[in-house]
Amino acid sequence: MAECKNIMVYVETAEGNPVKVGLEMLSPAKKLADKVTAVVIGGGVADAAKEVAKAGADQVICVDSEDYKEFNLDAYAQVLVELVKEENPEAVFVGGTQDGKDIAPVVAAKCNTGCASDVLDIKAEDGEVIYTCPLYGGTVLEDVKIKTTPQIATLRSGAFQKVEDPTEGEVVAKEVKVADDVIKAKITESVKEIAETINLEEAEVIVSGGRGMGSKENFALVDDLAKLLGGVVGATRPAIEDGWVSKIHQVGQSGKIVAPKLYIACGISGATQHVSGIMNSGYIVAINKDEDAPIFDVANVGIVGDVMKVLPVMIEEIKKIKDCLLYTSPSPRDRSVS
């Protein structure tokens, strides 16, 4: 039975596409509400809105304007506030992305309501919605009830699954103007840094290295394994502080919260700040010479050993398996057509 009449879900976009957590949030919203209204804001986001409609939203409000081509906290937050006034939702879900974590508290303040952060689970009891949120780096979980409406919540990426067998909703285009005096800061110029770009939050395979890798030269093995598995490289804060990889690779509380299908932790002890960022991974493999390392408490498979001896063997064996699969795969001529 639905606990809410209407839940609004703000679906962020990146390079014209809805981000993963945006689509994931539709699932808990549909379980709780009679109607799920998604909101897409930006410039040239009409196609993204259609994709959201196909992912399970009953209605998608598309605010497509060149005024919102570049993300602006004041403008985007005010657009959401105006739509909240129109739609009167009982709750607003926002993805726990860098921008989402900025928007949610601003919207909550403007609406004079409460905000639950980094939500891992949502349930309904006795007509109330309860948000489960981590504290102290994930070592403690607390249940949060918000007595005011609309309830605002940021949901962690990977904590929820996308809607299964969704029905397609409708897309409604709306023009929402924001007064100039609302915008406190404007982007006058954008300069893109010429550097590597990775998307840890969307990656299905992540191979991460910690200080246990020993040196920048040794860290190259992490990169080799990631490439072999078609994944991306992650790292702990100490490995980044030592200059082995750039900060863009940081996984954990002060980096990116990730939820890959496979996470391989190499030479990582398992500090709370790091573990809290990988808890939603589908399968965790840990390699560490210390059998008492905390990382083994969350790993599905633990390998106790010298990472510099284990990784070369893993890489070699995976290469053999891939070569074998390639060799045994039938050529087009070998395939029969019935």
Predicted regions, residues:
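N-terminal glycine-rich FAD/FM-binding segment characteristic of electron-transfer flavoproteins
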Residues: 1-326
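Conserved small/polar residues in nucleotide/adenosyl-binding loops
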Residues: 327-332
